[in-house]
UniProtKB/Swiss-Prot annotation:
Subunit structure: Part of the 50S ribosomal subunit.
InterPro entries in the record: Ribo_uL30_ferredoxin-like_sf (IPR036919), Ribosomal_uL30_bac-type (IPR005996), Ribosomal_uL30_ferredoxin-like (IPR016082)
Protein name: Large ribosomal subunit protein uL30
CDD domains attached to this UniProt entry: Ribosomal_L30
PANTHER family named among the record's database cross-references: LARGE RIBOSOMAL SUBUNIT PROTEIN UL30M, MITOCHONDRIAL RIBOSOMAL PROTEIN L30
GO terms for cellular component: cytosolic large ribosomal subunit
GO biological process: translation
Molecular function per GO: structural constituent of ribosome
Lineage: Bacteria, Pseudomonadati, Pseudomonadota, Alphaproteobacteria, Rhodobacterales
Domain of life of the organism encoding this protein: Bacteria
Pfam families in the cross-refs: Ribosomal_L30
Family stated for the protein in its record: Belongs to the universal ribosomal protein uL30 family.
């Protein structure tokens, strides 16, 4: 299956609780950390909820 590399570019400080939980759901918790995730509709939806906090670095597959 295809994967995407996601990088956290924004801080969760002073953000709504739902945005912080979305970051945790993606496996991110500190600035400039990256995660390689499966490219599924649920992951894409989570990324689309917080585009100001994360960026897609690379799409593989």
């Amino acid at each position: 299956m295809a994967t995407i590399v996601v990088k956290q570019i924004g801080s969760p400080i002073r953000r709504p609780e739902i945005q912080r939980k979305t970051l945790i759901g993606l496996g991110l918790n500190k600035m400039h950390r990256t995660r390689e995730l499966e490219d599924t509709p649920s992951v894409r939806g989570m990324i689309n909820k917080i585009p100001h906090l994360v960026e897609i670095v690379e799409e593989r597959g």
